[in-house]
Amino acid sequence: MQDYKRAVIIGSKQTFGKGTVQNVIPLDNIVRGNDHGDLGAIKLTTQKFYRINGGSTQLEGVKSDIVVPDRYSYIDLGERDQQNPLGWDKITPADYKVWDGYIDFDEAVKSSKERMAKNEQIRLIEENAKWLKEQQDENLISLNYDAYVSKEKEAKKRSEKFKSLRDYDSRLTFSSLQYEQELFTQDSVLREKRDRWHKDLARDIYVEEAVNVLKDLHKNNIKKKENELASVKG
């Protein structure tokens, strides 16, 4: 979608980049006469995926067009943070054409970046992410009781600042598809699940920005059609 310019990717710096095919090999099939019980299994990489532009998704993943922080932006989580990960490489690109259905695609991306840079909620998420990284890197624990308690109180006080992240309200409203709404009369559990999901979506600033980007692209697409009609009439 990104290579064809049919989508704007919004999110962290990159996806985890798991661009491989793996097979699970039971070790019991290899070791004969095993008296030690289940030996478990290992995963072997047998194939790799490539994008139409020739690049692998392994290690580098898909880089976002609009980078926004999340709580774990600075935490080492992916395979790229481990020892000896399978490297990124590139092959000959496929023969493809970029979709030209949007006008001012880059302008929509630029507008989103400007909104994100000014958003106080995003700044707070970034601050929270850096604080979590500090907590992860902290490897000294005082054996003095008073010093330890003081440090814990300080951390708790600082964490209070980030509780407001859970209270964010985009004021977006969501509704289930018609067929699900019909099921609600018979399935109250499904209704409760959807209600919780919709509330979570309303608190999600990334969903809110995705809607804003879609609005920009929609407006720009309308402009394109108006320009085409004007040129035909002219």
Where are these regions (language model features)?
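Conserved functional hotspot residues or short segments at active or partner-binding sites
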Residues: 51-230
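Conserved acidic, small-residue-rich alpha-beta core segments centered on
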Residues: 2-90
